């Protein structure tokens, strides 16, 4: 306390209040057993992990067609598109099936469904709706 008074030139009463205040903040951080028992366990609130905010489908405009590579044991070229959704988000959507006709500014319908071996792809484009045609059947 004398150190505070000498170095900062404050009164004895202010120095004792400063020490008491710092002590209270250090002790006040922990809850007592009775307080923890009363309030129950502390549960963290995590942000929701829903890519389309709980909606099953969303319409979007294609910004760019992409080819993504899967994670380690698999090897392929997964056809994807970068889509600006009607919710305002920009996300990557996978195009299922063989071949597609998508270009920039086309409109697609996206559903929730992640691609397990490609990180960051949480949507799939729906074939046969808007500008994304059905899979063309091969002639034998």
UniProtKB/Swiss-Prot annotation:
Q: Which GO terms of the molecular function aspect are on file?
A: structural constituent of ribosome
Gene expressing this chain: tko
Q: State the superkingdom.
A: Eukaryota
Q: Which GO terms describe its biological process?
A: courtship behavior; male courtship behavior; mechanosensory behavior; mitochondrial translation; response to hypoxia; response to mechanical stimulus; sensory perception of sound; translation
Keyword Acetylation found: no
Impact when changing residue 85 to H: In allele tko-25t
What family does the database annotate? Belongs to the universal ribosomal protein uS12 family.
A cellular component term (GO) from this record? mitochondrial small ribosomal subunit
| Entry's localization field | Mitochondrion
Give first and last residue of the transit peptide: 1-30
Other notes? Mutation of tko causes a behavioral mutation ('bang sensitivity' = temporarily paralysis in response to a physical jolt).
Q: Provide the alphabetized UniProt keywords.
A: Mitochondrion, Ribonucleoprotein, Ribosomal protein, Transit peptide
| Name of the protein described by the UniProt record | Small ribosomal subunit protein uS12m
Q: What is the lineage of its organism?
A: Eukaryota, Metazoa, Ecdysozoa, Arthropoda, Hexapoda
């Amino acid at each position: 306390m004398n150190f505070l008074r000498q170095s900062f030139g404050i009164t004895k009463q202010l120095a004792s209040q400063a020490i008491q205040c710092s002590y209270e903040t250090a002790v006040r951080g922990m809850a007592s057993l009775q307080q923890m028992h009363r309030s129950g366990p502390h549960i963290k609130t995590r942000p929701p992990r829903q890519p389309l905010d709980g909606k099953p489908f969303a319409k979007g405009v294609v910004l760019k067609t992409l080819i993504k590579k899967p994670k380690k044991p698999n090897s392929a070229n997964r056809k994807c598109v970068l889509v600006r959704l009607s919710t305002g988000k920009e996300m990557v959507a996978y195009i299922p099936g063989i071949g597609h006709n998508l270009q920039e500014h086309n409109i697609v319908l996206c559903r929730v469904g992640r691609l397990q071996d490609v990180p960051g792809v949480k949507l799939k484009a729906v074939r046969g709706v808007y500008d994304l045609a059905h899979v063309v059947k091969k002639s034998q």
